[in-house]
From Swiss-Prot:
InterPro entries: QueA, QueA_dom1, QueA_dom2, QueA_sf. This is S-adenosylmethionine:tRNA ribosyltransferase-isomerase. Keywords: Cytoplasm, Queuosine biosynthesis, S-adenosyl-L-methionine, Transferase. It catalyses: 7-aminomethyl-7-carbaguanosine(34) in tRNA + S-adenosyl-L-methionine = epoxyqueuosine(34) in tRNA + adenine + L-methionine + 2 H(+).
Amino acid sequence: MKVEDFDFDLPEELIAQTPLLDRTSSRLMVLDKESGEIKDQHFTDIISYLNKGDALVLNDTRVLPARLHGIKDETGAHIEVLLLKQKEGNAWETLVKPAKRIRKGATITFGDGALKATCLEELEHGGRILEFSYEGIFYEVLEQLGEMPLPPYIKEQLADQDRYQTVYAKENGSAAAPTAGLHFTEELLAQISAKGVEIIFVTLHVGLGTFRPVDVEDTQNHKMHSEFYRLTEESADRINKIKSAGGKVVAVGTTSIRTLETIASRHDGKLIAESGWTDIFISPGYEFQAVDALITNFHLPKSTLIMLVSALSDRTKILAAYNHAVEQQYRFFSFGDAMFIH
């Protein structure tokens, strides 16, 4: 299929720049993936679509405050570093600006010297392998010195960095939030659990590649970025039992879907305990083996994520739903409203 087939007109004012005061006060569009019927509801109405014996699968990754501002020791030049992926030990793959100032062997100091870095290797496109030195626990130092790397379409400063974390975020490693989960509060999850729905966690660390535009004309030529995922034995067993008993598996976010479908596609539809890297690209024609329904936000035109949701329903129904969302002034993207495809 052509990438252009997934385009739609989106007024810039519908791109949500800040989160709502209450996580659960966002709107919810409900789409029947077979009939295309659309209902406009509130996010708390999601409870009525979840039944006893279903599984609600959430991604418990935690966004790192991965943007650091430092000084090149040799010259005093200001350097911005964005952490991308942890390598061995204290080495990280990073994006450095301006990259030309940081060559192999250069050193950078952050804050009052609590964190230092040495360039081990130069990569293309501004990438650098940096080795960090510090006292204490790295993630605690990062919390003190780092900034949250918000998506490029969000222009406003975030007053409360916790609003770009889910309430159940636990596993450090993401460069971006699994934004479908931002709508849930602990109270709402407790209400869902009390109904007999099983709350199950997976981990997928979202990479910055999630914001990278698709730069090919035909979808079959697109190469996905890879992201680290983990599914525990307990979570795998619980989901398998629910599916065997006829319960539905409802994924919260495209990251949860990509985790489950990566594993199921390798093991004849069954889920097993597994961790690794996935570059699965889900687009129309893909046959889902693990997931029945999806809670997600509204995605960018011509993105791999709108292709994924089109695979769960179909392209014409999704684009009709998106056009309806524009007409009804839904809020789009990371801090926007939600959609339930079932």
